[in-house]
Amino acid sequence: MLFKKMNSVYPQRKINKRAVIMIMQFVETQKRHSRYERIFLKKRNFNVPYAFRRKGHGSVYSIIETERGGEKLKRKSDKTKLAEGRCLGGGDQYIGFIKANEIGSIGTSSAVYDPIAGRTVDTLSMGEKEFFWIMRYRNDVELIQEQMMLSSDTVRKICEEHGFRIPRNRLSTDFLITFRDGSRVAYSVKSGSDDFTPDSPKYGKILIRQYVELEYWKRYGVDFKIVLRENLNKTLAANIEHCMAYYDSAHVTGTETMLKYLVAHKAVSIPMDGEIVRFASLVRGNEDQIREAFRRYHDGR
């Protein structure tokens, strides 16, 4: 437990009311955006390449697991992780501060392969995994860095300034995403707005942690957004994941996988947010057109 309830640790100091107000305003903003602009909720006639039409960088959640059958590694110390050069560099050399198989509790963490970056991405929840695939498919995303560690010195200063207990271990933010226009946004993925209600057992801990992350990224000139899984279009994420498995033409074995390859490269646009796409049905009767489209696109690259 990174933070204990404030009244038990610092009886003379209450949780910063300004922190509570700011975090709650963020949650309400996320809820308004998803309700009115419908960025992540299901829509009919959804044209995937234009799914993220809003100029801002939207919002999105979490639970935790080690995949069944996957080898669970012994937890490494922060010192060892730093010595390994985690969170340094970009592209296929990047390694997040926490790996999926280093999670101490049973949940839904998984390591997914990013065919664009050419590396494994470690997601610590189903929500993080779904969020990753949606962001990966966006045209304006340049770089995705998961489990980005925070400077312990900066975190300590923030905690001291606000009377928060200083965490023993180094903190990390779920995602730091760099966009093609050069802007960067840090995302914290949470299960839903219920976690931010006073009745939630996680209420105090979550508010403090989110405020620390908010203040941290603010000091580095980076926007910070809370992402709620309840606003995430899980169907869209699943369809994107199915197609991205065939991003590399070496995995293409027939007309159905040819179509998935074309969708992964956005050479073909199909509705993917309403229901799980039945590619076999789409292929039936269109085999010749799909083969020709695949040949033209693949040969032209």
Region annotations inferred by a language model:
Residues 1:
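Helix-turn-helix DNA-binding segment
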